[in-house]
């Protein structure tokens, strides 16, 4: 395999075990960062042409330190003092409340693991884009506008996304075109160009699946979306830097590898509510009145999400891979995804599989680092685990991979 892609270094058992331990800790830290309300997504490398954050989320604050002013801190301190006083006056009630919170959270986590595991791909996502058709035509030399238009004809949401994109003046300036009020998807595809369509369609196809409007998880949605974009684009960039044929396949690989997160977060609110109702019924049947009435005060507990993501994302991604119909020409892409799901050592992977591993490592590093929570001393081990050359890290960051490079 190309040395531009991997370091080809062999490490002793002690170093390998340490790198694996650090990898598990960092992945866990990233899952907690995703759901934490304390950390917001750094906006400096977000591609607003594809993110829906401005539509559904609160006003964007570019720096985390701007979130809390000194006056707000004083107010929070006063409010905390009052809460503490009330807690002393109602200590027993708080104890019951705490136990109910833990009880519901435990039940909700078990319920989510069970129900999500049993769902079909259509149940998980509500709809599943026609990646089978896309992958069968997108990377062929015979790809043309007519073949691409089949997708916009059969997928109304994709059609609307394509039209919105080519009618966006800022986006059009990136591809050297003038914005027009286009209504014909075929003309819109022509405006984008075949190369840009093969690059962007997987992103536009998956875009409607993530629920940005859920008030419980709307703080998580921008982070999930950026993780998908980074994973997809960095996979493409690494394949490009290694001189692999059809590097744009990296976009689809990244999308398919990360979209399972969308399903988990999309279902969280409803599944938590279902679990809460089930516990209320149990308390009522057991005549536990205090616990029963305490249920009404419980809000969805996001702290269980990291465990659910950790337990299910590989299993659900296998369902995604199985849902796509692969051809003899695209089976290497399927194999790359399976290499990642099976945790095949990077040195034993195909170039696509190695690039996908490195892209995920970069995506996690980048977002944690921008929030100041990546452990710096872990960096050499983190990237050594995916055989990523040190110089590649800066090369990728210099390209601002949160934004998609387009052909003009």
Language-model-detected regions and their locations in the chain:
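Conserved alpha-helical "signature site"
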Residues: 2-255, 262-270, 301-408
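Flexible internal linker/loop segments at domain or repeat junctions
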Residues: 276-305
